[in-house]
Curated annotation (Swiss-Prot):
Binds 2 manganese ions per subunit. Its cofactor is Mn(2+). SUPFAM superfamilies: Macro domain-like (SSF52949), Zn-dependent exopeptidases (SSF53187). It is found in: Cytoplasm. Its EC number is 3.4.11.1, 3.4.11.10. It catalyses: Release of an N-terminal amino acid, Xaa-|-Yaa-, in which Xaa is preferably Leu, but may be other amino acids including Pro although not Arg or Lys, and Yaa may be Pro. Amino acid amides and methyl esters are also readily hydrolyzed, but rates on arylamides are exceedingly low; Release of an N-terminal amino acid, preferentially leucine, but not glutamic or aspartic acids. One of its GO terms (cellular component) is cytoplasm. Mn(2+) 1 binds at D256, D333, E335. Keywords: Aminopeptidase, Cytoplasm, Hydrolase, Manganese, Metal-binding, Protease. Mn(2+) 2 binds at K251, D256, D274, E335. One of its GO terms (biological process) is proteolysis. Belongs to the peptidase M17 family. This is Probable cytosol aminopeptidase.
Amino acid sequence: MKYRKRGWPSCWWPRAAVLPMRRQGVGGAEKIVRIADISGFTGALGKTAEAIETTPAGVEKIVLVGVGEPGKLGNDDWLKIGGAAFSQIGNAERVTLTLALPETTIAGDEAADVALGMVLRSYKFDRYKTRKSEENGEPKHAAKITVCVADTHSARKAFEVAEAVADGVIQARNLVNEPANILGPVEFAEEAEKLEKLGVKVEVLGEKELKKLGMGALLGVAQGSVRPPRLVVMEWHGAKGKEKPIAFVGKGVVFDTGGISIKPAANMEDMKGDMGGAAAVTGLMRALAGRKAKVNAIGVIGLVENMPDGNAQRPGDIVTSMSGQTIEVINTDAEGRLVLADALHYTNDRFKPRFIINLATLTGAVMVALGQYHAGLFSNDDELADQLYDAGQSTGEKLWRLPLGTEYDKMIDSKFADMKNSAGRYGGSITAAQFLKRFVGETPWAHLDVAGTAMGSPANEYNQSWASGFGVRLLDRLVRDQFES
C-alpha cells in the first residue's frame, strides 16, 4: 500500500472518496460530480457509484465511495470505507484511491484505517481450492493500490502500525479457518513458534511438563484424543526496565466433539473454530511484536482436542487442577473452562501480571443472550471492564458486560468436589465466567466470551471471512490506549 500527497481538487462530491481504477489516465474532478448526479449517488456510508470511460489513453473506471456525514464518522467507519472501496476493484491492475473531504482534514490514522479496511477485505481463505479465481470470478492478480491523501507522512507512519495489526488479524483468521485434520495442538504450537522471528520468546510445554505441573483439568480434556496437548507461552518484552507484564490467555480446543457428552452432528464441522480465543491471542502477540509495542505482554494458550474414545473423561469424573482445586466433570462438552482453569492459574502464578484477559469461544449461551454483534464481557475489575468496553467501541469489535455474583457462584458448587464444570441450562455464560473467576485470585481479570463473534459472524465491509479474527484489533487498541509507556 503506497501513499501519495494529493491536494484538494477544484471540484468534488462532498460525501465521497474517489477510486479511479485505470490502465492509464486520471479522470477530472468534474467527472465525479457528473457521475454522482446521473447515478443519484447520495454519499451514504459504504454506498458506491461507478462509471466506465474509454479515452485515448485507455480504459478508466471511476468509483465513488460514500463516507456519510464526515463530522459523524467514528468507530470502524473508516475501515468500512476502505472495505467498500476494495470490493469495487475487480480486475484493475493499478488503483488510485483519493481521500479528501470538503472543509475537513483527513488525519493520517484515518487514512491508515481506510487502507487497513482494504487489506482486511482482501483476505480470503482458499488454499484448499484447486480451481480458484477462474470459477469464482475473482481477480487473477493483486492490484497495486496507491492512496492519495494530504498528510502522507502521518499516513505512512500510522499504516506501519495498522499493517502489523492486519498481519495479526490475518493470522488469527487463518488459524480459525484451518481444518482440524491439518491443525492439531502440535501444529498450532509450531505456528506460534514462528513468532520468534519477530522477537517473541516462545516456550512450548508438552504432556510430560503439564503432568509435572499438575494440570489435571487441561489433561483431562486431552486424554480422549491421540493428539497430545500443548501449552504455549509467548513473551514480548517491549517496555523499558522490569515493568510487570499484561497477560492474555486463550482457549485452544482445536476440535470439539463434546467428548462423551457428544454434540449433535448438525454443524459440528464449525467446531474446528473452537480455538478462536487462542488464535486471537496468537494474532495479538504477532501484532504487538510487529509494531514493536512498548509494553511487556504475555500470551498463554492451552491447546487440546476433545474426543470421545475409550480413554476419554466421563461425566462424574473428578479432576484436580493445577491450583489444587478439584472439579467434578458434569458435562464433558463444558471442556473449555477446564483448559482455561489451568492456563489462567499458571499465568497468574508464574508471571504475576498487572491483569489477565482471557478469550474463549466458551458458550452457546452468550449467543442466545447477545447474538453475533457483541462478545460477552465479564470482569472482577470495573476499570478494566470500562477500558475494554471503550476499546470495543473504538474498533467496532463490541463488547457487552454481563453480571457476576455470589448467587451465580453458588450454582457451580459440587456435592463431591470444590466445584462442578456445568450448572445447567440457565445463565450458562455467567456460570462459566464464575468458574473461571475462581482461578485468578485477586488479579484484575476479564473474560471475553467470543463464541458468537470469532467465527460465523455476519459479514461486513471489511470481513467476508467465516473466521473474523475478533479480538486482535480490540486488544491492540486497549494496549495502545491504556498500557503502553
